[in-house]
Amino acid sequence: VYTTPGNHSRIVAKKEDALDGENMDVLLPFYLKARMQNFKNISIMDNRIEPEIAMFCIRGKTIMAAHGHKDVPANVVQSFTMMFGIKPDIVLLGHRHTNGLSTVFDTKVIQSGCVSGSDEYAVSIRKVNMPEQTVSVIDENGLVCLYDIQLS
């Protein structure tokens, strides 16, 4: 299990005043490690390339994941490739609260929605969406299928 901190649990409400790493999400790995320590089939992993970006392999494919508040789906592949010198096969993003799939330089960019749907802030900026998530099926060739799961 990897976690990617985002903008929803920052300590300071105004994003202009918030510092990177100052949010409650950074506590999640510590909490999960303590709570899951007796489950031998669950590992809570640390992000090694950058605190806000996870990188891991599934069936030989390189997956990178971020919350998405600092990324744009159309150029995230280029950004990650230039930052780390590794071109991902799949990029997972959230933040936009809606499911989506695009292909950028043969890399699949998958956006997952919000489990809880729209909150008060989302409504105030007219970004209303039903609760939804994605489920990815990945084999040795990459993304085989992407399920668009509606949770309403």
What is each stretch, according to the model?
Residues F56-R59:
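Active-site beta-strand termini and strand-to-loop segments that position acidic
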